[in-house]
Amino acid sequence: MADKHLSTQFDSELNGVSSRVMELGGLVESQIRLAIFALSQFSAESADQVIATEASVNAMEIDIDRELSSIIARRQPTARDLRLLIAISKTTANLEPVGDEAEKIARMVKSIIESGSARSLPASELNVAAELASGLLRKALDAFARLDTSVAVSILKEDDQIDEEFDGFVRKLITYMMEDPRTISASLNLLFVAKAIERVGDHAKNIAECIIYVVKGADVRHSPMAHIESAAK
């Protein structure tokens, strides 16, 4: 009976910390969406809201890490439970930087607005990459909540699209700067925005790899897609 009671407590603690991670995920997802809106509308007000949220993201990361450390020290989990806790830790470590990237986008948007060249920049060219990255993050969070390896594999495949969009945008931006050197400073800010968007996709990919690790016990980092698909079955 005592063992069953301890098991129930442990399950409750696992569910609690998992819920906290999903709460953090929801917060950074809203941050990145607001940052993308700030970019599309060149809205300083929206950018300020993104920046103001960053402190909450950082505080939640610290709370989750503290809770994880406590659970591991007290429960000494094994096998899949331990893998889940490790994955939660790594997922948290990938969500917090998404908040950082959102803040970076917001600050770059404000710099572009202050430069007075917002409307002349090809910011709309980033729309596809931004929506892809935001969508991948949403899929990664949903897949993590359900521990769905098939969705995790699809995320790893789709991340390549964001990389392609980024490369294409860089080529266009270089051409734009060559045609009008006066826009170089503001264009570089837009380049930093593009890189931040690409990194959001990278963090979604990392979360997808964590899902496969929890469910299958396979570390698929830096692995070819054929191996990933086989490991996730």
Feature annotation, model-predicted:
Residues M1-K233:
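Cytosolic, long alpha-helical scaffolding segments
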